[in-house]
Amino acid sequence: MPSFVFTSESVTEGHPDKICDQVSDAILDALLDQDPNSRVACETVVNTGLCLITGEVTSKAKVDFINLVREVIKEIGYFGAKAGGFDSNSCSVLVALDQQSPDIAQGVDEADDHSGNPFDQVGAGDQGIMFGFACDETPELMPLPISLAHRLSRRLAKVRHDGTLKYLLPDGKTQVSVLYENNKPTAIDTILISTQHTAEVEGITSEKGIREQISKDLWELVVKPATEDLPIKPIQEKTRFLVNPTGKFVVGGPQGDAGLTGRKIIVDTYGGYARHGGGAFSGKDPTKVDRSAAYAARFVAKSLVAAGLASRVEVQLSYAIGVANPVSILVEAFGSGKMSNEALTELVTENFDLRPGAIIEQFGLRSLPNQRQGRFYRDVAAYGHFGRPDLNLPWEDVQDKAKELIESQK
């Protein structure tokens, strides 16, 4: 097969869209922490000096939304003299939340196809299609380009938070291009980092000097540490390294661009390496299959790869609003499977319970915020929902399921 280059991007927690995802999920955490049966569909908008939260919420919880929003924005790094025009202390916070539609609630509360089984009584919160993916390119069974991009974004945020690079500001993006030969990653072709910074960097004020200093620092303190344990590493003489290609990046965050919840769905998943059903995750409670079924689809795909039944798997699920059982299940192994796609699909149908109620129960999706000191989804909202070695995510824990699948084939 001819060689090709595949590219994926990530963004830091200070990117305007990611601020919104984290705010929406912090609100979800706070509501589920007090009332695990909360129904939440929370959208956030940020712009210069403004944060608006809107959507639908039905919950017994009592939450100080305004203070919570300010706390999230402050933790990201938008406060004080280095706030870059967006300050947690002074921005306006508007709350416009309504109750969930009773027409939607009745279908979720009592599924159209229920049979007395409690899992049959929870219908899907909406129609839709969801995809899950896994491959053997990394230890966490994720595509290498998005895995690398997230590593760089996390490291970029770390050296900002710990003061290693004091001139860095919260907004930033990374992009990684990987060379593939015979469908296997063989080299890192290009790394791009765009990072917000102060107007003066280490006493340097010229645009050229600032970019040179940032490039030097990022290679040594971000790129090298983020990739040191990988078999495929960037090589300074061969890997193209681009930093702030426009020259400078002083105005950023909500001061530079408006942000919205759900605009980084490819960053949240597989970096474009697999298909996406179109539904965002953040701000949605587990009855929304956009979120819970996408987590389940990842669990299925990762289990199949971990069991050695294929080296690359994509799983599609579809649902109808108010109906518990999936409308369809499809497994595609791209020729890498030890059995046909039809046989893999049958195996999944027989071994995985993909009703929303069962997914919620298996992963503990309603109780996780309470079990983890009031915050869970907020931590997942930045740097990807899958393949997270830094977080203990239930849909990533496939060891036992992989063993079950292996045993089922004996």
Swiss-Prot record:
Record pathway: Amino-acid biosynthesis; S-adenosyl-L-methionine biosynthesis; S-adenosyl-L-methionine from L-methionine: step 1/1
Keyword Metal-binding annotated: yes
Cofactor(s) for this UniProt protein: Mg(2+); K(+)
Keywords: ATP-binding, Cytoplasm, Magnesium, Metal-binding, Nucleotide-binding, One-carbon metabolism, Potassium, Transferase
Listed GO biological process terms: one-carbon metabolic process; S-adenosylmethionine biosynthetic process
Domain of life: Bacteria
Stored Pfam families: S-AdoMet_synt_C (PF02773), S-AdoMet_synt_M (PF02772), S-AdoMet_synt_N (PF00438)
Enzyme class: transferase
Cofactor binding, per record: Binds 2 divalent ions per subunit. Binds 1 potassium ion per subunit.
Single GO molecular function: ATP binding
CDD domains: S-AdoMet_synt (cd18079)
Subcellular localization, as worded in the UniProt entry: Cytoplasm
Enzyme Commission number(s) of this protein: 2.5.1.6
Residue span of region Flexible loop: 100-110
PROSITE patterns per UniProt: ADOMET_SYNTHASE_1 (PS00376), ADOMET_SYNTHASE_2 (PS00377)
Reaction equation(s) it catalyzes: L-methionine + ATP + H2O = S-adenosyl-L-methionine + phosphate + diphosphate
Major place of residence: cytoplasm
Alphabetized InterPro entries for the sequence: ADOMET_SYNTHASE_CS, S-AdoMet_synt_C, S-AdoMet_synt_central, S-AdoMet_synt_N, S-AdoMet_synthetase, S-AdoMet_synthetase_sfam
Chain sites annotated for binding Mg(2+): D17
Positions that bind K(+): E43
Role this protein plays: Catalyzes the formation of S-adenosylmethionine (AdoMet) from methionine and ATP. The overall synthetic reaction is composed of two sequential steps, AdoMet formation and the subsequent tripolyphosphate hydrolysis which occurs prior to release of AdoMet from the enzyme.
Family to which this protein belongs: Belongs to the AdoMet synthase family.
Subunit structure, interactors included: Homotetramer; dimer of dimers.
Annotated HAMAP family: S_AdoMet_synth1 (MF_00086)
Protein name listed in UniProt: S-adenosylmethionine synthase
Species of provenance: Prochlorococcus marinus (strain SARG / CCMP1375 / SS120)
Gene label: metK
